[in-house]
C-alpha cells in the first residue's frame, strides 16, 4: 500500500475542533472555522465538527485497526480532508482488511456521547484467554509518581502507598518508572516487587507495574519472561508507557501485548499511545489508555469543556485527575473543577494522582474514595455547550453524581435541576461549590433533595461543581 485516497468533505461554515499531537494525543484542542483551516495542516483523526446554531455534531475517526497503520487527516482546504497515513511509508498487508473509516452524525451532545460506533465497529473478543475472566477488575489506584517522580525509586515510599491505598479503599497501587532502581539488578528488583505484593495482598490491594515500550519488551523472549514473572509474583496489571507511534508495527504491537498479557491474567493500560480505536472490545484486559491532554500537561479548563465531546467518544481515558498539591498542574482551575474531572472523565483503571492522605486532610476523601469507575447511566444535561460549559449526570446503582466544567472565559451562574434523580425518592446530596474569592477553597454542604429540587450554582472562571446523591 503506497497511499490511501479516502477523502471527507465537510461544509466550510462548520466549526472544527482538532489537535495536532499525532504521536500521543496530548495537544491542546484548537478551534477554527473549517473554511479557515490551512491547506496541508495535519491533525489527529478524532476531529469534531459543529454546525453553528443547528445542533448537529460530526466526528471523523477510525476503528478496528489490524495490521495497518493509524491515520490522521490532512486539510486540503475548503472543507476537504484526506486520509494521511502519517507514520509510515509504503507497507504490505495480508488478507486485505482495512480499518473502519467512521463518520458519526448526532443531533445533540447527549446523543454524541452515547454514540458507541468506535467501540462496536471493533471486532468482538474471540480468545480463550478471556474465558472466566474474573481477574479483569476495574478499580481506583494510588499513584505516588505524580506528586514526586522520585517516589517510585524509593521502595519504602511505595510500601507506604500500599497502606494509603488500603485506608482510602482503593483497589490498586501503581509502582511507576523507577521500581527497577530498588536493587542493583532486575532480578533483585523483582524480589522487592514480591515483598511489595505480599504486603499489598494482606491489605486487599493489587499491584500494577510500569514498563516502557522503549525497553526490551519488543524482544519476544524477554517479553514472555516478563509476563510470566509478573503472573508468578501476583501482579495485577502493566502500564505500558512511551509508545508514541501509529506505525503498522506498533498498532499490531498493541494487540500482541494485550493478547499475551491476557494469557498471564494481566490487565493493561497504555500511556502516550495512539488514538482509541475500540481495542478494549477485542481485548477486554485493556482497561484504559491515555491519549488525552490530562493532568500531567497541567489542568486546562477550556480544553476540558471540549474533550468530553471529542476524545471521550473513544472510551476510557487515563486523565490521572485529582492532584491539588502540585501548583503547576492545578494551574488556574478550582478544586470543584478538579472534582468534576473525576466524574466526567471515566477510566476502568482510575489513577488517582493525589496522595490519599492529602485528600483526607482537605475533606475530599468522602467524595473520592467511594467514587465509582464504572457507570450504569450517563447524561449530558441541557445547558452544555462545547468550549464553554459541560454538565454531566452519572448513575452507579442507586447513587447519582453531577459534575460541571466551567471554561476560563468568565464567572458563570446556572440553575441545575435535579430531574435526573428517580421520581418519588429522597436523596442525601453532598454538594461541592466554588469559593468565588479563593481558587483553592470550596464550599461543602449536605442537604436532602428530590427530583423536584434544583441548585443555583455560581462558578469561578475555570471553576466547576460536583455532587453525589445517595438515596435514603
How does the language model describe each region?
Residues 175-334:
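Aromatic- and carboxylate-enriched substrate-binding clefts and catalytic-loop regions
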Residues 336-380:
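Catalytic cores of secreted or luminal carbohydrate-active enzymes
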Residues 93-172:
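An acidic-aromatic substrate-binding cleft motif
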Residues 13, 18-25, 431-452:
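Solvent-exposed beta-strand/loop surfaces of large extracellular or lumenal domains
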Residues 165, 268, 344, 402:
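Conserved, mostly hydrophobic/aromatic
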Residues 1-122:
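N-terminal accessory beta-strand-rich subdomains and adjacent acidic, glycine-rich linkers
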Residues 447-472:
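C-terminal beta-strand-rich structural cap/linker in extracellular carbohydrate-active enzymes
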Residues 385-423, 465-466:
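Carbohydrate-binding surface patches
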Amino acid at each position: 500500500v503506497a497511499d490511501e485516497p479516502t477523502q471527507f468533505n465537510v461544509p466550510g461554515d462548520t466549526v472544527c475542533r482538532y489537535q495536532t499531537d499525532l504521536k500521543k494525543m496530548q495537544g491542546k484542542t484548537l478551534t477554527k472555522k473549517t473554511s479557515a483551516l490551512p491547506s496541508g495542516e495535519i491533525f489527529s483523526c478524532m476531529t469534531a465538527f459543529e454546525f453553528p446554531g443547528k445542533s448537529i455534531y460530526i466526528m471523523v475517526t477510525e476503528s478496528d485497526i489490524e495490521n495497518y497503520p493509524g491515520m490522521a487527516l490532512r486539510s486540503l482546504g475548503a472543507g476537504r480532508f484526506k486520509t494521511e497515513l502519517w507514520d509510515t511509508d509504503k507497507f504490505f498487508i495480508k488478507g486485505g482488511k482495512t480499518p473502519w473509516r467512521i463518520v458519526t452524525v448526532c443531533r445533540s451532545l447527549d446523543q454524541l456521547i452515547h454514540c458507541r460506533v468506535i467501540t462496536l465497529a471493533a471486532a468482538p473478543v474471540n480468545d480463550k484467554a478471556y474465558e472466566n475472566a474474573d481477574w479483569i477488575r476495574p478499580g481506583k489506584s494510588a499513584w505516588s509518581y505524580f506528586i514526586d517522580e522520585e517516589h517510585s525509586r524509593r521502595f519504602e515510599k511505595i510500601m507506604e502507598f500500599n497502606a494509603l491505598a488500603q485506608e482510602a479503599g482503593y483497589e490498586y497501587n501503581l509502582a511507576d518508572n523507577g521500581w527497577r532502581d530498588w536493587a542493583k539488578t532486575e532480578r533483585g528488583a523483582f524480589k522487592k516487587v514480591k515483598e511489595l505484593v505480599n504486603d499489598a495482598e494482606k491489605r486487599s490491594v493489587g499491584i500494577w507495574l510500569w514498563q516502557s515500550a522503549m525497553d526490551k519488551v519488543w524482544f519476544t523472549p524477554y517479553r514472555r519472561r516478563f509476563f510470566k514473572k509478573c503472573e508468578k509474583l501476583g501482579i495485577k496489571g502493566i502500564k505500558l508507557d512511551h509508545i508514541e507511534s501509529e506505525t503498522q508495527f506498533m498498532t499490531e504491537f498493541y494487540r500482541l501485548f494485550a493478547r499475551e498479557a491476557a494469557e498471564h491474567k494481566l490487565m493493561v493500560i497504555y500511556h502516550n499511545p495512539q488514538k482509541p480505536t475500540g481495542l478494549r472490545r477485542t481485548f477486554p484486559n485493556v482497561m484504559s489508555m491515555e491519549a488525552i491532554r490530562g493532568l500531567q500537561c497541567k489542568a486546562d479548563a477550556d480544553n476540558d469543556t471540549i474533550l468530553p465531546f471529542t476524545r471521550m467518544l473513544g472510551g476510557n481515558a487515563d486523565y490521572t485527575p485529582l492532584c491539588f498539591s502540585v501548583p503547576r498542574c492545578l494551574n488556574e482551575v478550582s478544586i470543584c473543577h478538579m472534582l468534576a474531572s473525576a466524574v466526567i472523565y471515566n477510566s476502568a483503571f482510575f489513577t488517582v494522582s493525589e496522595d490519599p492522605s492529602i485528600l483526607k486532610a482537605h475533606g475530599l476523601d468522602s467524595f473520592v474514595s467511594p467514587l465509582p469507575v464504572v457507570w450504569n447511566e450517563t447524561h449530558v444535561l441541557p445547558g452544555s455547550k462545547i468550549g464553554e460549559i459541560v454538565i454531566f449526570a452519572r448513575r452507579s446503582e442507586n447513587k447519582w453524581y453531577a459534575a460541571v466544567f466551567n471554561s476560563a472565559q468568565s464567572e458563570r451562574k446556572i440553575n441545575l435541576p435535579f430531574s435526573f434523580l428517580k421520581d418519588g425518592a429522597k436523596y442525601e446530596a453532598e454538594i461541592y461549590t466554588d469559593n468565588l474569592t479563593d481558587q483553592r477553597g470550596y464550599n461543602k454542604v449536605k442537604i436532602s433533595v428530590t427530583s423536584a429540587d434544583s441548585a443555583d450554582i455560581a462558578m469561578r472562571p475555570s471553576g466547576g461543581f460536583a455532587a453525589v446523591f445517595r438515596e435514603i
